[in-house]
């Protein structure tokens, strides 16, 4: 990887009298500064410089060890001290005339990358030429906010994805084989019996009394077997996630294709909307194009992962030692994901119901709680639901974004997927997960412990649609075929709604 940077520092006055001091600086001090921390023979170098009136023009060439933009930032402070102390000159701004990044690659990139004005591919080398896109955010902002580094990381991620790098999956435990009582599609059978009907939106279902009672039984099992015994407290998390929440949680790096966006109206004034109202009254049609003009930019999206909004409750706080670990859960509303062509029955939907379990504390507390949860889940799946299921370690979403996979890099953080076999398709489906997220959320939301010890957190989502798909897919809809322990908790089947 190579970098070439041509930059002009705007000074507060003519710098001709400073030429001698600058020459000495670039010949001695700058050389050491730009090699610091790099292997021998590596780093950055000033390939040329000159003074033109109140402009100090510098050319920097470098490798990956001291990138050119980092080299410039290393030079800025000592240059400011030299020019200010001896020549009463200040640095007023940074303007980049050329910034190239060259990286080895076996292909051209096919997608536009922000702040990349031009790209070319030749002889196994991919060259990116950077440019400023937002006039409000010039080169100083780009360099100080490490935009070039993020571009390099994004480029490496894309080149990796072109190679088809797969998610890591490692089997941890598998239940013994069990006899299945049903071999059909549970969703089709639920529709046939009037337990559920399609809602008006894609990937949405209306649950009748029978299906709802099944959901509530699963909820009660989770409460009685996990949440109450382990001391979890119930909260209500917001179901609208703003951009700031997703930036802090890390979801803003890649959530865009799957979220339902929320756009507020530009005005609450009824007169502003009168044209829309009148159009509908006359045509009985919704004027979507007109509405589009009257709504503002999205402020975020509908609930996607459920736990991120909880962290706003703790944001910026210092927690007393005796308050840890904190253990809470939320079951107050739906989550929404745009599944595109992947929707299928109640297994994969756009609107779903979930109990979100969150815990945080010291690393030891979080790891110990994860083990307790795993034991309780195993008890439920083995002794109450009697499922054919397995546990696997998979690459957590946040580690996948950072290009890390495998148990060797987990260092205590990681995700356990719980998968069950669907007899009608022969496929294993994820119906439950448990994640130890390390310091990610406490750091992202600036949550600290009184002791100064690093805080960790974990979360686990109980998806009621997935539990239903798996349970009915293996046991069927006839309660006589259900395990005794589950039937005790389920009780009587409620009467459904009849139609003529």
Swiss-Prot record:
The record's subcellular locations are: Cytoplasm
The molecular function terms in GO held by this entry are: ATP binding; serine-tRNA ligase activity; zinc ion binding
Q: Name one Pfam family in it.
A: tRNA-synt_2b
Q: InterPro entries attached here?
A: aa-tRNA-synt_IIb, aa-tRNA-synth_II, aa-tRNA-synth_II/BPL/LPL, Ser-tRNA-ligase_2_arc, SerS_tRNA-bd
Quote the PROSITE patterns the UniProt record gives: AA_TRNA_LIGASE_II
Q: Name one GO cellular component term.
A: cytoplasm
**Catalytic reactions on record:** tRNA(Ser) + L-serine + ATP = L-seryl-tRNA(Ser) + AMP + diphosphate + H(+); tRNA(Sec) + L-serine + ATP = L-seryl-tRNA(Sec) + AMP + diphosphate + H(+)
Any idea which positions bind Zn(2+)? 307, 356, 459
Q: What is this protein called?
A: Type-2 serine--tRNA ligase
Q: Which organism is it from?
A: Methanothrix thermoacetophila (strain DSM 6194 / JCM 14653 / NBRC 101360 / PT) (Methanosaeta thermophila)
């Amino acid at each position: 990887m190579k970098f070439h940077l041509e930059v002009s520092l705007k000074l507060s006055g003519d710098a001709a009298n400073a030429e001698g001091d600058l020459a000495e600086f670039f010949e001695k001090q700058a050389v050491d500064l730009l090699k610091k921390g790099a292997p021998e023979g590596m780093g950055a170098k000033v390939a040329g410089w000159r003074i033109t009136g109140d402009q100090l023009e510098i050319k920097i060439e470098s490798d990956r060890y001291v990138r050119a933009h980092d080299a410039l930032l290393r030079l800025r402070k000592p240059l400011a001290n030299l020019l200010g102390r001896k020549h009463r000159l200040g640095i007023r701004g940074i303007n980049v005339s050329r910034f190239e990044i060259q990286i080895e690659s076996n292909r051209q990139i096919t997608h536009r990358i922000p702040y990349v004005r031009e790209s070319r591919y030749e002889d196994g080398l991919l060259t990116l030429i950077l440019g400023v896109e937002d006039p409000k955010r010039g080169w100083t902002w780009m360099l100080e906010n490490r935009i070039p580094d993020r571009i390099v990381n994004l480029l490496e991620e894309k080149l990796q994805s072109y190679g088809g790098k797969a998610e890591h999956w490692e089997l941890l435990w598998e239940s013994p084989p069990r006899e299945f009582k049903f071999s059909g599609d549970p969703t089709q059978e639920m529709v046939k019996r009037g337990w559920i009907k399609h809602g008006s939106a894609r990937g949405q279902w209306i649950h009748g009394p029978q299906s709802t009672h099944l959901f509530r039984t699963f909820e009660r099992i989770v409460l009685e077997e996990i949440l109450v015994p382990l001391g979890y407290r119930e909260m209500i998390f917001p179901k609208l996630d703003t951009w700031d929440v997703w930036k802090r949680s890390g979801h803003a790096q890649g959530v865009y294709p799957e979220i339902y966006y929320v756009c507020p109206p530009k005005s609450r004034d009824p007169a502003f909307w009168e044209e829309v109202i009148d159009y509908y009254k006359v045509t009985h049609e919704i004027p979507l194009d007109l509405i589009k003009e009257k709504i503002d930019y999205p402020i975020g999206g509908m609930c996607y992962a459920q736990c991120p909004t909880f962290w706003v409750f703790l944001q910026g706080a210092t927690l007393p030692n005796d308050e840890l670990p904190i253990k809470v859960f939320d079951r107050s509303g739906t989550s929404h994901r745009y599944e595109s062509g992947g929707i299928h029955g109640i297994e994969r939907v756009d609107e779903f119901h979930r109990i979100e379990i969150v815990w945080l504390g010291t690393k030891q507390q979080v790891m110990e709680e994860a083990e307790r949860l795993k034991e309780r889940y195993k008890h439920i799946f083995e002794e109450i639901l009697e499922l054919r299921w397995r546990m696997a370690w998979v690459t957590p979403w946040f580690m996948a974004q950072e290009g890390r996979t495998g148990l060797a890099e987990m260092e205590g953080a990681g995700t356990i997927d719980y998968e069950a076999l669907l007899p009608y398709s022969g496929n294993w489906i994820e119906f439950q997960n448990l994640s130890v997220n390390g310091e990610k959320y406490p750091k992202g939301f600036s949550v600290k412990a009184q002791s100064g010890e690093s805080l960790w957190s974990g979360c686990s989502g109980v998806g009621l649609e997935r539990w239903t798909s798996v349970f009915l897919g293996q046991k069927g809809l006839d309660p006589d075929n259900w395990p005794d322990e589950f039937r005790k908790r389920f009780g009587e089947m409620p009467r459904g709604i009849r139609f003529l």
